[in-house]
Structure formats: structure tokens, C-alpha cells
């Protein structure tokens, strides 16, 4: 979780065996205490909207909806892959963000530069390594989580020009979500209400995929 105030940021991260749902609210209260603020002082919210873990996305969104219930403060829905790519600040040229999607696949998107909100180079989707290797530009930097490392290894065998960045850059950074969210909220029309938000899974849950015959969301 992170809080932006002026030009500074306060961020709390954790790696705990406890369920995400048990850690999130206490961390939010700790964050506000560190900044000597109350929840009522917060002008707007940003959330990493997906793709990602079904459970993680649901917990995060349910928590935000609880905080914003009956509230008119704006919410920014930040694409998760854009936030991950933003961690490669200082890189020049295209940067692709990869997250483990299991089944030998990754969620991926490619951006013209770190900090871009729109995946103009390659739109977010679910890829096998061979398909992704055929579509990434030359010398693309790769931001990846631990689970995507096997895919990145195969990618680099197919495309030696690709540049995997340190795995530490692929860890979730709430401050990146907050900074992109603030940019979204600078355009009032882009702000969302709590009841209009839905997780961006990309890959449909198995039951829905079977019912619709479509494994991916539009």
C-alpha cells in the first residue's frame, strides 16, 4: 500500500504467509498513521485492477469498495501490467511486463517506455513464450515476477536481444500504482466510482470460460 502527498510517497510492503485479506486493512491504517492523516483526508484512491491472482484482485477491490462506500471521492483503475512496467524507471525504449498466468503462459503487455499507461506497443493478453517472442520489439526490457522467470528464460533463448531486468523490479510496487493513479485522476472523466469497478482478469474463470466458449475477456 502507498500514499502520495505532494511530491513524496510513503509505502508499506510485506511478504507474509498470512492471507492478504488479514494484512491489507492493518497496513492501510499503519500507512495513514505514518503520514499523520485520517482516511477522510485522502482525496482519491488508486487500485491495481488486473490481470493477476483472482483472489488477490477480489480482496483488493472488496477492500477499496468498503472504504469508498457511499463516498464521492474518485478512484483510478490502474492496469497492473502498466504499474509493473513503471518500476523500470530509467530504462529507455520499450518495456514489457510479464506476470505468471500458470499453464505455461504469462500475462504480458509492452509499453513504449516505463510510466506509460497505454500498452501501445503490444496490448495486454495471455501469451505462450513462442507467441510473445514473435511480437516483442528488438531490445525490449522485461519486467517479470518470480513466476514468469521460466517463460523469460525461454523468451531469451528464442530472442537473445531481449533484456530481462532484475527480479526485484518485478515485485508489486504500490507507489507505482499510486503515481499512475494520480495521473489518471488528473483527467476527471477517467475517474471511476466504486460500484463501476470490476477486476480485469483477462483469463475468464474456468466455469465462465466453459459457459461462454471464450477463455479470455474481451
Task: Describe the residue ranges of each PLM region.
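Flexible, glycine/charged-enriched surface loops at secondary-structure junctions
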Residues: 191-195
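Surface "functional belts" at beta-alpha junctions
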Residues: 9, 13, 19, 74-172, ...
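N-terminal beta-alpha supersecondary unit
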Residues: 1-49, 171
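DPxDG-like acidic metal-binding loop motif
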Residues: 46-77
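Short, contiguous clusters of charged residues that form electrostatic/catalytic patches at enzyme active sites
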Residues: 22, 26-33, 83, 127-130, ...
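Stable alpha-helical structural segments in soluble proteins, enriched in small hydrophobic residues
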Residues: 31-35, 70, 88, 177-185
Amino acid at each position: 500500500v502507498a500514499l502520495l502527498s505532494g511530491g513524496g510517497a510513503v509505502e508499506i510492503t510485506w511478504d507474509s504467509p498470512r492471507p492478504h485479506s488479514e494484512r491489507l486493512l492493518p497496513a492501510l491504517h499503519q500507512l495513514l498513521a505514518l503520514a499523520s492523516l485520517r482516511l477522510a483526508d485522502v482525496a482519491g484512491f488508486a487500485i491495481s485492477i488486473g490481470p493477476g491472482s483472482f483472489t488477490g484482485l477480489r480482496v483488493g477491490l472488496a477492500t477499496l469498495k468498503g472504504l469508498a462506500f457511499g463516498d464521492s471521492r474518485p478512484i483510478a483503475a490502474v492496469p497492473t501490467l502498466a504499474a509493473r512496467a513503471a518500476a523500470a524507471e530509467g530504462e529507455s525504449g520499450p518495456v514489457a511486463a510479464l506476470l505468471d498466468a500458470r499453464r505455461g503462459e504469462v500475462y504480458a503487455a509492452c509499453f513504449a517506455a516505463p510510466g506509460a499507461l497505454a500498452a501501445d506497443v503490444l496490448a495486454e493478453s495471455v501469451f505462450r513464450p513462442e507467441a510473445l517472442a514473435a511480437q516483442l520489439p528488438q531490445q525490449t526490457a522485461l519486467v517479470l515476477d518470480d513466476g514468469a522467470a521460466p517463460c523469460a528464460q525461454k523468451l531469451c533463448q528464442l530472442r537473445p536481444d531481449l533484456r530481462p531486468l532484475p527480479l526485484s523490479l518485478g515485485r508489486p510496487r504500490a507507489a507505482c500504482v499510486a503515481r499512475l493513479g494520480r495521473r489518471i485522476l488528473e483527467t476527471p472523466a477517467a475517474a471511476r466510482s466504486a460500484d463501476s469497478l470490476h477486476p480485469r482478469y483477462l483469463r475468464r474463470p474456468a466455469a465462465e470460460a466453459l459457459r461462454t466458449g471464450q477463455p479470455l475477456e474481451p
